[in-house]
């Protein structure tokens, strides 16, 4: 079976299960994940034969998607604010509409940073993947560095495995964010300039 044949069959199966979604897009994403090839490579070399090992992997991935499992959970990753983030079933999948929250928080932060405070603190409650905290850190770190302002971004979550996941996302994106296990403010000290959730 070639890339082209698998894409057509998978897209048809996905469209039958959920006609409102674009089965072709999901099929292509699964094929990229299973083969490690880019979209361009797959489409340019669509007559490439799929070996047995990859075909078995594709069958398992497609079965999960046909059962309604979100693509992000299948891949274990979702991009948010141009940051690749690991996700798990213990976290919500970062959504594009959450970027509106990040934009608003950035607007408020930039206004407050005009006053050149020596220290600026942000708290993300129920951080999950760390998406909001990491997006804010990615934007504000360079600004604070230029202005000689100490930036502290802290994310808290109740579940220890979620805190580990958020920390791995910080490391993956080389961002300085502290993640703590806490029930809301329980293990957090001090005051914050911005609190998001």
Residue ranges, per PLM feature:
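Conserved SAM/SAH cofactor-binding pocket of Class I
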Residues: 100-197
């Amino acid at each position: 079976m070639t890339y082209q044949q698998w894409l057509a069959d998978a897209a048809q199966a996905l469209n039958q299960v959920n006609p409102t979604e674009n089965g072709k897009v999901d099929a292509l994403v699964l094929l990229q994940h299973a083969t490690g090839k880019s979209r361009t490579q797959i489409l340019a070399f669509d007559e490439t034969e799929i070996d047995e090992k990859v075909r078995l992997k594709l069958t398992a991935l497609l079965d999960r998607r046909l059962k309604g499992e979100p693509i992000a959970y299948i891949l274990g990753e979702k991009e948010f604010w141009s940051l690749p983030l690991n996700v798990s079933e213990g976290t919500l999948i970062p959504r594009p509409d959450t970027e509106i929250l990040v934009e608003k928080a950035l607007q408020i932060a930039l206004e407050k940073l005009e006053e050149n405070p020596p220290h600026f603190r942000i708290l993300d409650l129920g951080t999950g993947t760390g998406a909001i905290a990491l997006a804010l850190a990615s934007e504000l770190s360079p600004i604070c560095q230029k202005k000689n302002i100490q930036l502290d971004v802290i994310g808290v979550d109740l579940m220890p495995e979620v805190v580990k996941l958020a920390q791995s996302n910080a490391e993956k994106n080389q961002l300085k964010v502290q993640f703590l296990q806490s029930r809301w403010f329980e293990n957090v000290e001090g005051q914050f300039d911005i609190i998001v959730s």
